[in-house]
Amino acid sequence: MDADSDVALDILITNVVCVFRTRCHLNLRKIALEGANVIYKRDVGKVLMKLRKPRITATIWSSGKVICTGATSEEEAKFGARRLARCLQKLGFQVIFTDFKVVNVLAVCNMPFEIRLPEFTKNNRPHASYEPELHPAVCYRIKTLRATLQIFSTGSITVTGPNVKAVASAVEQIYPFVFESRK
């Protein structure tokens, strides 16, 4: 088994965070009273709204900014954001769906082997940091992709990046390094 051989690694996307604007002021009290599946957090000045399909939780501010979390793909995130905008339109707001952007993607990938973390950290010192007293994983940052990887000794890798393509590239880029330090 060598690092160059094509190994099919399953990258499971667990969370996609996206943002969009409604281009109108939103009355949070009206959303709280008339909307479905809503939690009004008056002390913070926001409303949480949940959709069942796709399973998304949205944080809505009176300025018209909406953050959606919980989607499992970029397409599902956009679909859920548009459904949310439609729900707000049905409540009587003049919503215009604009400035949609995927801001964060969280994914999990399992390597087919275990990893020696101290050796991995020593070999990749400027990018990797390992504090076993604080956290059981190595934190590895790839600045060019704006991705952060949490590498565990079991071979599980949690990747956070700005989009799905960056997450996939980060896993491809890290594979030869973790392969060198396998148990």
From Swiss-Prot:
Which Pfam family, just one, is annotated for this protein? TBP
The record describes the protein's role as: Part of a specialized transcription system that mediates the transcription of most ribosomal proteins through the 5'-TCT-3' motif which is a core promoter element at these genes. Seems to also mediate the transcription of NF1. Does not bind the TATA box.
Instruction: Give the UniProt subcellular location, in the record's own words.
Output: Cytoplasm; Nucleus
Q: Which tissues is it found in, per the record?
A: Present in the brain, heart, liver and gizzard.
* Family listed: Belongs to the TBP family.
Ordered alphabetically, the record's keywords are: Cytoplasm, DNA-binding, Nucleus, Transcription, Transcription regulation
The source organism is Gallus gallus (Chicken)
Gene Ontology annotations of biological process type: acrosome assembly; DNA-templated transcription initiation; dTTP biosynthetic process; spermatid nucleus differentiation
Name the gene for this chain.
Answer: TBPL1
Q: List the disulfide bonds.
A: none
Gene Ontology MF terms in the entry: general transcription initiation factor activity; RNA polymerase II core promoter sequence-specific DNA binding; RNA polymerase II general transcription initiation factor activity
Q: What is this protein called?
A: TATA box-binding protein-like 1
Q: Which Gene3D superfamilies match?
A: TATA-Binding Protein
Listed GO cellular component terms? Answer: cytoplasm; male germ cell nucleus; transcription factor TFIIA complex
> How does it associate, per the subunit comment?
Binds TFIIA and TFIIB.
